[in-house]
Amino acid sequence: MWGSPALAWAVWLACVQPTVFPWSLSFRSDTDKPSSAAEVLTEASSCWTDTVECFSDYMTLWIPRSHVEGLRRWLARTLHLPGTWRSPDHLDSSLAKCGYFLHLASDGDFLFRVQYSACFVQKEKANYRLEIRIFQKGVMGLERSDRYIMKCPMLRSRLGQESVHCGPMFIQVSRPLPLWRDNRQTPWLLSLRGELVASLEDASLMGLYVDMNATTVTVQSPRQGLLQRWEVLNTSAELLPLWLVSGHHAYSLEAACPPVSFQPESEVLVHIPKQRLGLVKRGSYIEETLSLRFLRVHQSNIFMVTENKDFVVVSIPAAGVLQVQRCQEVGGTPGTQAFYRVDLSLEFAEMAAPVLWTVESFFQCVGSGTESPASTAALRTTPSPPSPGPETPPAGVPPAASSQVWAAGPAAQEWLSRDLLHRPSDALAKKGLGPFLQTAKPARRGQTSASILPRVVQAQRGPQPPPGEAGIPGHPTPPATLPSEPVEGVQASPWRPRPVLPTHPALTLPVSSDASSPSPPAPRPERPESLLVSGPSVTLTEGLGTVRPEQDPAKSPGSPLLLRGLSSGDVAAPEPIMGEPGQASEEFQPLARPWRATLAAEELVSHRSPGEPQETCSGTEVERPRQTGPGLPREGARGHMDLSSSEPSQDIEGPGLSILPARDATFSTPSVRQPDPSAWLSSGPELTGMPRVRLAAPLAVLPMEPLPPEPVRPAALLTPEASSVGGPDQARYLESAPGWPVGQEEWGVAHTSSPPSTQTLSLWAPTGVLLPSLVELEYPFQAGRGASLQQELTEPTLALSAESHRPPELQDSVEGLSERPSR
């Protein structure tokens, strides 16, 4: 009785089961249902949506090991491979060339991966579609095969972007958040080193801070404890091995930063992990090497790329990207901090979309008592603004804002106009996150030919008097910012420079009406030095003493200057007199090392037409004998050069001029006027309390000689001519470059045939104080991407020597400004 139903049940199972499921795939999902032999998988079937997984660059299909041989046979037949290439080893290499991959899973099954750019992948509407077939065992005809449709939507969100912020204490990574194609999203989890998995709410237990909105995810990690140290191609990098995971998907947040350092090197390194930045399959690690096809650095055209199977390393000269900003140490001490921002565009052969990788790296904050971080790097900045002294500014000078950022290149004005104080974002602040630094737009420079940065300076340190001794009390110096035009071609010297001090954002240069400068300090022939500077083209307004940059972009950039022996005396500039017309202004971008220095004891060469003798003079105030004639001012006329106003003044376009690092410069220009300058007339303030120096005899005059077209060398010393005051000990060594080709329309009436006249000079400096020269300061600033080396060699240069004693006669007399001739 009991055996009959059991036997009947067994017979029924034996007869029915083989005919119901003859050629079906075994699916892992409980919701998947196998189909009968008479049926094939079509788009209407519910199986393809569960078995096909879609990612950013590819789609995958799980293949049981019992069916992988049928897939191989179909692929070999479709790709028309010969019989000898149908073995598994040869087949896999052939499949890779077409964008197909068969990966062995840990359980013995296979994962079939198809790139969206693979062979036979079709684009229909907003989907990628591929039809494949799997042959049944022992059958080669398509009539006995199973058909599968692999179909994935095109992702609209661009996931090939990553922004990395490398701070001294933490690393911050920001990436676009993937958008799901359906509502079946599972919560995102954090995976560290592929092992530790935590929810976003528990990320703080790992020391991580997460800010996630609808479009962006930002993660901040401390440097201590979570980073892995890597040695990559003889360089060091610290890697954050962090991923976002959800279901079968993984999303990389990996980022690499250089080790923390106080001082930049001559080049900056960017380490980019070789990985897919989009959604990838979570789980088994697939050995894959990406092939770099294209790379571009937006801030520089000079870079070097090396790579291995894990990283792409980009080396960029620091001169093109390094910048400096103000900072505060832990104790509140003000200092400076070097940083750089680099934007790179990359293309890998295996990725459908390009990659945009942005790195911001900040060095340690350096206080006033330590070495400047910018002293050993080629800063992409122009000379720094004047520093009021070694520790404290003079009375009446307001401290500079701590948020002032020094930038150079095309992004300089944008840096100056933005508030770059580091402040936490609102979203991070609500979650108790650490500092969330704002980033600036990259300085995108134009395409130029790549060249090796010239190295032309080898500085030697000499004794120098304490800074600030030559300063004149009671005359506060306005703040200053220096020009955004980069300079190029200076190599840092091995000596340790003095600390960087805060400076101020405006520079006022009072001058007299004649080209003059005070006598330089004592000669130091045993310390030759040349400093190549390339700067913006500057207009010299003769008679008015106004210096402003050229407004015509078609004009050539300023000629480099070879400057020697420039003093660093502390001469303050007076404030403009109320009611006077505004003066022309010029914005300068500073370097990381501000100096309290002036051109009050420097030599300037007044260029005249090629047919006339050249005049050299020293001092800051010059009185000429009365001259008559149209366009010439009356006796004793003086001008004022002010860089704090934007109102134009009468000018005569002349040679390009570069101002050396951060000096309260006192310039003088010959007393001339262009015809009809009524619209631009302006007068400067009257200076009081300034001692004056007079010379009893005119100085020697040397003709201008052209420089040979060869690399720049230290200024050579010519045969000295004894001065009438002081004898041979006060001989002046002067070498001047060829004069600029100036036409009559450029110099106007400045170049006349009148002979040079005896001049009376005065020096704005206390009696008995020896002003230090630039040779003694020996500050090796390095320049950014300015004019090319070929341009610098073909443009005229000016070599100045400061190897003569100061005149002994000092008189405490002050002359007021005389009125200009009426029209």
Curated annotation (Swiss-Prot):
Record's protein name: Ciliated left-right organizer ZP-N domains-containing protein
Main location: secreted
Function: Plays a role in left-right patterning process.
Skewed-composition ranges (Low complexity): 389-402
Superkingdom of origin: Eukaryota
Compositionally biased tracts (Pro residues): 216-230
Cell compartment(s), UniProt: Secreted
The keyword S-adenosyl-L-methionine is annotated on this UniProt entry: no
Keyword Secreted appears in the UniProt entry: yes
InterPro entries found in the cross-reference section: C1orf127-like, DUF4556
Pfam families cross-referenced by the UniProt entry: DUF4556
Gene Ontology annotations for the cellular component aspect, listed alphabetically: extracellular region
Any single biological process term in GO: establishment of left/right asymmetry
Record keywords: Disease variant, Heterotaxy, Secreted, Signal
